Amino acid sequence: RSESHAVWASSDISSAPCGANEEMPFREADKADTQLTFYAATKKANESMAHSYAHLWNIPTTMFRFFTVYGPWGRPDMALFKFTKGIFEGTPIDIYNHGDMYRDFTYVEDLVRGIRLLMDAVPGGPETAVDGDTLSPAAPYRVVNIGNSDKVRLMDFIEAIEAETGIAAKRNYMEMQKGDVFATWADASLLRNLTGYAPKTDVRDGVAKFVKWYRDYYRV
């Protein structure tokens, strides 16, 4: 295709740019000026710089806000990998805020499909807008959430891992980390309006796929 379209990942969880916003579910148009960490501030700056590029050089640009992506080949420093590894090895897993936290877990295959479909939803003039759009009036630019639209309690997530491994976790309950947020929850209606698609993998099914991959890859 001859038409250019820059696509950027703003963050791996929308709590980064949304910061202390307590409105649920998170909408792309919600005010996002109360970042709680330097990491989150860089993500908000990333979105601002992308908007500037889109305006100055008329480059159609879509920013993705990912919500707690998980699945096979996930990063070893992320919760699902760390929890699964700790459970298999019999080492304690750190559970912040005593497990009373919520995350919108999004399976990686759903994420990839959402990205692929959004690549064809090129932002442009007002004629490209849909209901609930974040299309900028100053540039061919929009922000889109990609999330499962379902907040899951952290303890339920851990119990799903225990059920798949058949092993009870050794739990180390801890206080909330400074700069962390109590919950993330995506309003993915813009993704649906632009593409007709919405992530749908139930967290228990996604965890089962990850644990199977982990068993096969690490031979446990």
What spans do the regions from the language model cover?
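C-terminal substrate-binding subdomain of Rossmann-fold SDR/epimerase-dehydratase oxidoreductases
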Residues: 85-220
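Catalytic helix-loop patch of NAD(P)-dependent Rossmann-fold dehydrogenases
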Residues: 1-10, 16-63, 70, 74-75
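Hydrophobic pocket-lining residues within nucleotide cofactor-binding pockets
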Residues: 69-70, 176
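Rossmann-fold scaffold of SDR-type NAD(P)-dependent oxidoreductases
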Residues: 11-12, 145
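Residue-level recognition of specific faces of alpha-helices
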Residues: 63-66, 104
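Non-catalytic, surface-exposed connector residues within folded enzymatic/regulatory domains
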Residues: 20, 60-63, 77, 140, ...
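Active-site loop/turn elements of alpha/beta-hydrolase fold enzymes
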Residues: 14, 66, 98
